[in-house]
């Protein structure tokens, strides 16, 4: 927004300097400046016009491009299948943002609800840049994937000790249709449309997540992604909803924001195996989450000494 205002200000200054607008050149400068300011600051259907045009063009390019799986060689993700998922797992999971000398870029809990059945995964992503010294201390060849898997196995053992069934998996379901066409409101395939949403993180978060599960949908996805440090974690929440019909332009619930024109990358990031962060801005934990997480994280961290990864 600041850059947009600064750019518009440059055109205003150019128009002022072109006074008294008597020559053809001066009038051209005035006209172009007025048009540029209007385009830069025009607001249409919830976003700036230029943003809308940019997203539309990017969407066209993605639809024309061949389906490829983008990978980041500097990041690795390990995924755990958890049965059943429970809020009591949150403190344990958040503690692994920085555990045994390894810092995770993100730790995520993902739920898929379809046909009355829930599947849940915990994903840990390690960034080599953030852990270069720790990785070099383990091996000269920078064992990123091996180290990530070790952290995942430690978390799996930790959860098993507390009574949950945990399995390290390599293949998972994904909310993004394999051969779907992206539209402004979602990604469409023969079975319907999947739309991605950002979820507002506030004291109503638990209520909104419960409401998502009760939507008249064939399939819903929700993901809670923790970043930052165990002491001061940040949270990003996203969701995906599959319906047989085209979704409305307006979000189905208060607290949801559609990923207008960005559904494909948003859904790709929702894949539990993705190394990318969720589409959205990470914010401090709301009180309803912070109360249950913080004390337990401090207790878990006290047990870390003497257990290097």
Swiss-Prot record:
The keyword Cell inner membrane applies. It is a multi-pass membrane protein. It comes from Mycolicibacterium smegmatis (strain ATCC 700084 / mc(2)155) (Mycobacterium smegmatis). The lineage of its organism: Bacteria, Bacillati, Actinomycetota, Actinomycetes, Mycobacteriales. Its main location: membrane. Part of the ESX-3 specialized secretion system, which is required for siderophore-mediated iron acquisition and for the secretion of EsxH and EsxG. Belongs to the EccE family. This is ESX-3 secretion system protein EccE3. The gene is eccE3. The keyword Cell inner membrane applies.
């Amino acid at each position: 927004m600041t850059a947009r205002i600064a750019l518009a200000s440059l055109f205003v200054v150019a128009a002022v300097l072109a006074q008294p607008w008597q020559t053809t050149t001066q009038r051209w400068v005035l006209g172009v400046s007025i048009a540029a300011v209007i385009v830069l600051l025009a607001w249409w259907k919830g976003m700036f016009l230029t943003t809308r045009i940019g997203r539309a063009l990017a969407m066209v390019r993605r639809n024309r491009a061949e389906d490829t799986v983008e990978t980041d060689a500097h990041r690795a993700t390990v995924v755990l299948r958890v049965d059943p998922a429970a809020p009591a797992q949150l403190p344990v999971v958040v503690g692994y943002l920085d555990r045994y000398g390894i810092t995770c870029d993100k730790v995520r809990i993902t739920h898929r609800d379809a046909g009355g059945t829930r599947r849940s995964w915990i994903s840990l992503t390690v960034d080599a840049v953030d852990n270069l010294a720790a990785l070099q201390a383990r091996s000269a060849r920078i064992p990123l994937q091996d180290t990530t898997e070790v952290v995942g196995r430690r978390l799996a053992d930790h959860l098993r000790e507390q009574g949950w069934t945990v399995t390290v998996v390599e293949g998972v379901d994904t909310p993004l249709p394999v051969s779907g066409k992206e539209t402004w409101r979602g990604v469409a395939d023969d079975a319907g449309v999947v739309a991605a949403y950002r979820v507002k993180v506030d004291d109503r978060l638990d209520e909104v997540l419960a409401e998502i599960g009760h939507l008249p949908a064939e399939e819903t996805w929700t993901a809670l992604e923790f970043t930052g440090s165990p002491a001061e974690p940040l949270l990003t929440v996203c969701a995906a909803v599959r319906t047989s019909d085209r979704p409305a332009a307006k979000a189905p619930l208060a607290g949801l924001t559609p990923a207008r024109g960005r559904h494909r990358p948003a859904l790709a990031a929702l894949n539990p195996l993705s190394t990318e962060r969720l589409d959205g801005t990470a914010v401090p934990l709301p009180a309803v989450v912070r109360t249950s997480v913080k004390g337990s994280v401090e207790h878990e961290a006290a047990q870390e000494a003497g257990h290097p990864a």
